Amino acid sequence: FSEKQQLVFGSFLTKEYSVESAALFNPSIVEHPVQSGLAAGETRFVLSLRSVGEGHISSVGFMEGVIDGAHHIHFTHQGPWRTPGVKSISNGGDDDHYNITFGDDIPLPERVIFPQSKSESMGIEDLRLVKFSDHGETKYLGTYTAYDGKRILSKMLETTEFQHFNIRKLKGSEIDNKGIAFFPRKINGQYVVSARQGGEKLTIMRSEDYMTWNHKEPLQQPNRGFELVQIGNCGSPIETPEGWLMITHHVGPMRRYTLGVTLLDLDEPHKVISVLDKPLMEPLESEREGYVPNVLYTCGWMQHGDSILIPYAMSDVACGFALLNTEEILERLLNNKK
């Protein structure tokens, strides 16, 4: 068949789908695996975004960019099209254990991870990415909530270059939660995550193999006015000499979402050193109207020099960036130490 004939045949078998037509929100950010060709003080990053299209189906899209020493952000150009990866089953036919591969000709900003199994048929929600290092090896882990329209399932993707992805479901008696976020390295020889339990409080969990989670320890529970509905993490912690900085979300009256920060012990992360006594960020008047109103939310942040870059969603209709001075936030936390 000629190329024109192939295009005609293909048009009858193709449906156009706009992955971002309803909402674009809940970003996560990590250092890009390629840091070559940059000027001093620059960091290249990967930004993931939750995209919602027709039928309220959530998928994962990507952007990439560079933040320079003056904190200016420059994004890589992206075209108008998004291309899903090619799926292959990798665990004896288990629909929840599969691989996704993108061709070399598809740039990262044009790749989309669309639901590929029954358990996530209605969406891949709130990917929390982390750059994970162990014995000199680096990989990227991302936890997300799979949704089939009735039930949720905690799943994880793993990649080294954002071209080939291995996707699996997490296991264990304590894993049926939302908002699971890995710490960026092992602690005392174990993998560690924070997670929301019971729909309202934060816990710490440990695992030997990073797939099976059977034990939890309490971390934080809502007890202040601006968080009485629930509290949860907003991505993986950042390591500092004073402890782990963990960004959190707090839900209060009128289901108003604000962001906060908690400082955890480096060696015993179930121990809280300090929490901010009031929200770090809250919706501005210009940010409160949207698909889900009165909400600020993020799924991760990134260290850049002496600052922390926070991508955040405003009421599920747009995303922006905030910059946090690491020394200043640590000083506030240590002055408010328990």
Predicted segments, located by residue:
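Glycine-rich phosphate/diphosphate-binding loops that line cofactor/substrate pockets in enzymes
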Residues: 302
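Catalytic core of Fe(II)/2-oxoglutarate
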Residues: 232
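C-terminal structured domain segments
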Residues: 291-298
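Beta-rich carbohydrate-recognition and catalytic domains
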Residues: 1-124, 130-181, 185-229, 239-291, ...
